[in-house]
């Protein structure tokens, strides 16, 4: 319940909440926002973009499309604060229509725990080179994965 969520949050000294994992836009964001924003929480979301985020419910929207894994997905959340793309060798021109709705563009190398250091290093290198040659994009790393921190 919303009351249980507020009780749990009150145990922590924080004022920013990030909704992520699975697809958080499947939850009732309007009710969550109406409950949490008056308490002073800044709300962020990382979404695959297939479900539009109701205007005014979330303070920071990160769209991270899963279009390389699921080719038939349609991105419906076309505006936000950041567009974060996992780089698998795709042409960045495929995001030309989408990227104008975002303030920040991030390209992230795929880190695969099932692969060896050399493979992951090549993934990083190819992403780094892509960013170097496309300066409107910035490099984003999931540092905890590279460090082996769970």
Model-derived features with residue positions:
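Structural recognition of alpha->loop->beta junctions
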Residues: 6-11, 55-71, 131-138
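Glycine-rich S-adenosyl-L-methionine
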Residues: 2, 85-94
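Short loop/helix-cap segments at secondary-structure boundaries that form the rim of catalytic
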Residues: 51-58, 72-79, 94-100
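Conserved Radical SAM active-site core
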Residues: 1-58
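Short, polar loop motifs at secondary-structure junctions
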Residues: 46-53, 65-69, 87-91
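Auxiliary Fe-S-binding modules of radical SAM enzymes
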Residues: 11-14, 90-150
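Structural preference for beta-strand elements that scaffold enzyme active sites
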Residues: 16-18, 42-44, 60-62, 80-84, ...
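Anionic group-transfer/hydrolysis microenvironments
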Residues: 22-25, 48-50, 66, 110, ...
């Amino acid at each position: 319940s919303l009351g249980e969520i507020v009780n749990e949050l009150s145990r922590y000294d924080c004022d920013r909440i990030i909704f992520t994992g699975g697809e958080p836009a499947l939850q009732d964001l309007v009710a969550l926002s109406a409950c949490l924003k008056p308490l002073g929480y800044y709300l962020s979301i990382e979404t695959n973009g297939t479900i539009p985020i109701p205007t005014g419910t979330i303070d920071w929207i990160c769209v991270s499309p899963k279009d390389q894994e699921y080719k038939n997905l349609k991105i419906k959340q076309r505006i936000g604060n950041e567009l974060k793309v996992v780089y698998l060798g795709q042409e960045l021109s495929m995001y030309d229509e989408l990227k104008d709705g975002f303030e920040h563009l991030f390209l992230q190398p795929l880190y695969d725990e099932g692969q060896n250091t050399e493979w992951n290093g090549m993934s990083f290198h190819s992403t780094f080179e892509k960013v170097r040659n496309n300066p409107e994009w910035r490099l984003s790393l999931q540092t905890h994965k590279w460090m082996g921190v769970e």
